[in-house]
C-alpha cells in the first residue's frame, strides 16, 4: 500500500495559492544599484541562498542516501567533522568562488580559501551550525558574515566593518534573516519556485524579555557572578528580579537566534571553568560577529559579557568568544552580574 503519494499541499484557511511577496534577489538588486561593493555583496548573498536551497534538499532526505552524521575527520580545533559538515563546506566554497568573492573563511578549513584576486568582498561562514542535531529533527542553520576585502587580512577586522550578515534556519520552514545595514529582513524559501520571498522588514526585538537561552547543565562551571544571575532569574517573582523566567535552549546558535529575533529573549554562551571553555566556545568571526550585526540592526545588543562584540579585533581566524545577545535591557542586566 502506498502511504505517501504525489498529493497537492494542504491549503489552510486564508492561504493564497500565489506567493507575491518580493524576492530577496529583487531586493538585493535594488539595494545594490550600480555600486561595485554592493553588487559583490549581493552576489555573495545570492550564492549562499542558492547553496542553502541545495543543502536543505539533502537535509530533508535524512538517512535515505546514507548517514549524514558519519564522522569523517576533525577541523582546525579538533572538533569532529561529519560528512554533512564537509559536504556543506565544499558546496558553499564552490558557489562563493563562482560568485567572485575574494576569499572565504569557513569553520571547516584551517585557513581562508582564496577566491577571485580582485574580488571586493570576503565571506566568513559556518556552513552548517548545529550539525550535532543532524538526523534528529532539531535546528540546523547556516550563518555568514560579509566584510570588505580592502585590507590584507579581511577576517581580522572588527565586526563593525561588516557590510552584511545573515543566517538560514533549516526547520519546518527554511527561513532567512539578514541585513545589509538597513534593518533586519526575514524571508522564507518557497519550495515551488525555489526563491526566498520577504515576509517581514525592519524586525525589532521587544524592550523586555523573560526568556533565557543557555545550557543549564554547565551552571556549576560558571563564574560566581553568572551563577548569581541564573539563580536570581530562577527565583522568579519571589526573587530580586520580581518576575518569572522561562528557559529555551535549542542547542544551535542559529536556532536560538531565529527564535529570539522573532519572540525576544536572551542568549548566553559565556566562558566557564571547563578546559577549552576559558574564552567561550562560539567563533568570533563567523558566529558572534554576524549575530552581533543582526542584533544591532534589530535594536538590541551583543557583548562578550562586558565588551560589544562588534568592537573586538580578532587575533586569529577561529578565535573563540563568549557571547551574550538579545533584548538590550537584559543584556545590560547580565553585564552587571558578569563583572562581579
From Swiss-Prot:
Please list the cofactors this protein needs. Answer: Mg(2+)
Extract the GO molecular function terms from the UniProt entry. fructose 1,6-bisphosphate 1-phosphatase activity; magnesium ion binding
This protein's pathway reads: Carbohydrate biosynthesis; gluconeogenesis
Q: Which GO terms describe its biological process?
A: fructose 1,6-bisphosphate metabolic process; fructose 6-phosphate metabolic process; fructose metabolic process; gluconeogenesis; sucrose biosynthetic process
Q: Which InterPro entries match?
A: FBPase_C_dom, FBPase_class-1, FBPase_N, FBPtase, Fructose_bisphosphatase_AS
Residue numbers binding Mg(2+) 2: 126, 129, 287
Q: Which reaction does it catalyse?
A: beta-D-fructose 1,6-bisphosphate + H2O = beta-D-fructose 6-phosphate + phosphate
* CC cofactor note: Binds 2 magnesium ions per subunit.
Record's superkingdom? Bacteria
EC number(s) on file: 3.1.3.11
Q: Is Acetylation included in the keywords of this UniProt record?
A: no
Q: Which residues bind substrate?
A: 215
Key words of the record: Carbohydrate metabolism, Cytoplasm, Hydrolase, Magnesium, Metal-binding
Q: Which of this chain's residues are annotated to bind Mg(2+) 1?
A: 107, 126, 128
Matches recorded under CDD domains: FBPase
The compartments listed are: Cytoplasm
Question: Which Gene Ontology cellular component annotation is one that this UniProt entry carries?
Answer: cytosol
Where primarily located? cytoplasm
Share what the entry says about its subunit structure, partners included. Homotetramer.
State the family named in the UniProt similarity comment for this chain: Belongs to the FBPase class 1 family.
Q: What is this protein called?
A: Fructose-1,6-bisphosphatase class 1
Q: What is the species of this protein?
A: Brucella ovis (strain ATCC 25840 / 63/290 / NCTC 10512)
Gene name per UniProt: fbp
Amino acid at each position: 500500500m502506498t502511504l505517501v503519494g504525489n498529493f497537492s499541499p494542504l491549503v489552510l484557511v486564508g492561504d493564497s495559492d500565489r506567493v507575491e511577496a518580493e524576492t530577496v534577489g529583487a531586493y538585493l538588486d535594488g539595494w545594490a544599484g550600480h555600486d561595485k561593493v554592493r553588487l559583490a555583496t549581493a552576489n555573495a548573498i545570492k550564492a549562499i541562498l542558492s547553496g542553502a536551497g541545495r543543502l536543505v534538499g539533502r537535509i530533508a532526505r535524512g538517512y535515505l542516501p546514507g548517514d549524514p552524521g558519519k564522522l569523517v575527520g576533525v577541523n582546525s580545533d579538533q572538533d569532529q567533522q561529519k560528512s554533512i559538515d564537509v559536504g556543506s563546506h565544499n558546496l558553499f566554497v564552490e558557489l562563493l568562488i563562482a560568485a567572485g568573492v575574494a576569499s572565504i573563511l569557513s569553520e571547516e578549513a584551517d585557513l581562508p580559501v582564496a577566491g577571485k584576486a580582485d574580488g571586493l568582498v570576503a565571506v566568513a561562514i559556518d556552513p552548517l551550525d548545529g550539525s550535532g542535531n543532524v538526523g534528529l529533527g532539531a535546528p540546523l542553520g547556516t550563518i555568514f558574515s560579509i566584510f570588505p576585502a580592502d585590507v590584507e587580512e579581511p577576517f581580522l577586522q572588527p565586526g563593525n566593518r561588516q557590510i552584511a550578515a545573515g543566517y538560514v534556519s533549516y526547520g519546518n520552514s527554511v527561513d532567512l534573516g539578514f541585513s545589509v545595514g538597513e534593518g533586519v529582513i526575514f524571508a522564507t524559501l518557497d519550495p515551488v519556485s525555489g526563491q526566498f520571498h520577504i515576509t517581514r522588514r525592519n524586525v525589532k526585538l521587544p524592550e523586555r524579555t523573560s526568556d533565557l537561552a543557555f545550557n543549564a547543565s554547565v551552571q556549576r562551571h560558571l563564574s560566581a557572578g553568572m551563577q548569581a544571575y541564573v539563580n536570581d532569574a530562577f527565583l522568579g517573582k519571589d526573587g530580586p528580579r520580581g518576575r518569572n523566567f522561562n528557559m529555551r535552549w535549542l542547542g544551535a546558535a542559529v536556532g536560538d537566534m531565529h527564535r529570539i529575533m522573532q519572540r525576544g529573549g536572551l542568549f548566553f554562551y559565556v566562558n566557564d571553568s571547563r578546559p577549552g571553555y576559558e574564552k567561550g566556545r562560539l567563533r568570533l568571526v563567523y558566529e558572534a560577529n554576524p549575530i552581533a550585526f543582526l542584533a544591532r540592526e534589530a535594536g538590541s545588543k551583543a557583548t562578550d559579557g562586558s565588551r560589544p562584540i562588534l568592537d573586538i579585533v580578532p587575533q586569529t581566524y577561529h578565535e573563540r568568544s563568549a557571547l551574550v545577545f538579545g533584548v538590550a535591557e537584559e543584556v545590560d542586566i547580565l553585564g552587571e552580574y558578569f563583572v562581579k
